[in-house]
Curated annotation (Swiss-Prot):
Pfam families: PCRF (PF03462), RF-1 (PF00472). This is Peptide chain release factor 1. The keyword Metal-binding does not apply. It is found in: Cytoplasm. It comes from Erwinia tasmaniensis (strain DSM 17950 / CFBP 7177 / CIP 109463 / NCPPB 4357 / Et1/99). InterPro entries: PCRF, Pep_chain_release_fac_I, Pep_chain_release_fac_I_sf, Prokaryotic/Mito_RF, RF-1. The keyword Glycosyltransferase does not apply. Methylated by PrmC. Methylation increases the termination efficiency of RF1. Peptide chain release factor 1 directs the termination of translation in response to the peptide chain termination codons UAG and UAA.
Length: 360
């Protein structure tokens, strides 16, 4: 391992011990905000500190085994131990490289999840409903909370569009690779000839931003309409014009929120989504500029981004970005998504490592 990386790891280990001591201090415990911030930092440093400690141990094991090689009686055992220690050292080095990758500050945040029916009419809306149910099940398995903010239901079930907030630690980091186009191939229930149809939906995932990080929005750039809540998400239907639709005139972005009784609360929520959408659009523009020089696995939420195909007759899901196919479609639709999410997270980390290596 490079001396510069070892020095960085030693500094992080020292900081880990320092934070541990601070968490036991009565003054810090009394200051809840500081205590929470230090607890988060401690949790983030724990993995890298433990891994580095194991790597240091593997270096000592290598040194001991190399010294034993000069002893004829111990040589065979020493060679075996040396091989084991070197393999452990190599694996731990790789783990440490991943742990040292720059963290996306948004990864730990809540997120907004938007699912829209694309081509395919009623079948696309039904599939949008299936996708939303799939993500809701996944959120449930991770003990996240899903709050529907706006829903436009399809005529034969599902959704033309559904927007929800996913509340839970790490929600954005796990779901951010879902942004993009999702295709389904199956025989619709309304199909009498048994023909397979292809329909499409788009998914967009954006981090929920703290107020301080929301972009400045000029009130004169907004067109605000009120209407009566209807359908899922608006339980108190036809009572008052509490639902809100906000149009950001410079970008044409439209946001609706209808899940609260209070117009004021719906407006505040809609402005939060709008801010996240404006920032996401800016990030997508930057990513497009970067993607001319490197592959970009993070979708923009545009239908031209082809993420996955869900083929029901064959029971398979294919992720086109990393050429991954799994034959566990039923499990995936029930929210067991780690088999699809984990490989793309690993691929993304590998791309980051390759980019960092290129900078050295």
């Amino acid at each position: 391992m490079k001396p510069s990386i070892v020095a960085k790891l030693e500094a992080l280990q020292e900081r880990h011990e320092e934070v541990e001591a601070m968490l036991g201090d009565a003054g810090v415990i009394a200051d809840q905000e500081r205590f929470r911030a230090l607890s988060r930092e401690y949790a983030q440093l724990t993995d890298v500190s433990q891994c580095f400690r194991q790597w240091q141990q593997s270096q000592e094991d290598i040194e001991t085994a190399e010294m034993m090689l000069s002893d004829a009686e111990m040589r065979d055992m020493a060679q075996e131990e040396l091989q084991t220690a070197r393999a452990a050292s190599e694996e731990l080095e790789q783990q440490l490289q991943v742990l040292l990758l720059p963290k996306d500050p948004d990864d730990e945040r809540n997120c907004y999840l938007e699912v829209r029916a694309g081509t395919g009419g009623d079948e696309a809306a039904i599939f949008a409903g299936d996708l939303f149910r799939m993500y809701s099940r996944y959120a449930e398995s991770r003990r996240w909370k899903v709050e529907v903010m706006s829903a436009n239901e399809g005529e034969h079930g599902g959704y033309k569009e559904v927007i929800a907030k996913v509340v839970g630690e790490g929600a954005y980091g796990r779901l951010k690779f879902e942004s993009g186009g999702h295709r389904v191939q199956r025989v619709p229930e309304t199909e009498s000839q048994g023909r397979i149809h292809t329909s499409a939906c788009t998914v967009a995932v954006m981090p929920e931003l703290p107020e301080a990080e929301l972009p400045d929005i000029n009130p004169s750039d907004l067109k605000i309409d009120t209407f009566r809540s209807s359908g899922a998400g608006g339980q108190h239907v036809n009572t008052t014009d509490s639902a809100i639709r906000i149009t950001h005139l410079p970008t044409g972005i439209v946001v609706e929120c209808q899940d609260e009784r209070s117009q004021h609360k719906n407006k505040a929520k809609a402005l939060g989504v709008l801010g996240s959408r404006i920032r996401a659009a800016e990030m997508a523009r930057r990513q497009q500029e970067e993607s001319s020089t490197r592959r970009n696995l993070l979708g923009s939420g545009d239908r031209s981004d082809r993420n996955r195909t869900y083929n029901f007759p064959q029971g398979r899901v294919t992720d086109h970005r990393i050429n991954l196919t799994i034959y566990r479609l039923d499990e995936a639709m029930e929210g067991k998504l780690d088999a699809l999410i984990e490989p793309i997270v690993q691929e993304y980390q590998a791309d980051q490592l390759a980019a960092l290596s290129g900078q050295d």
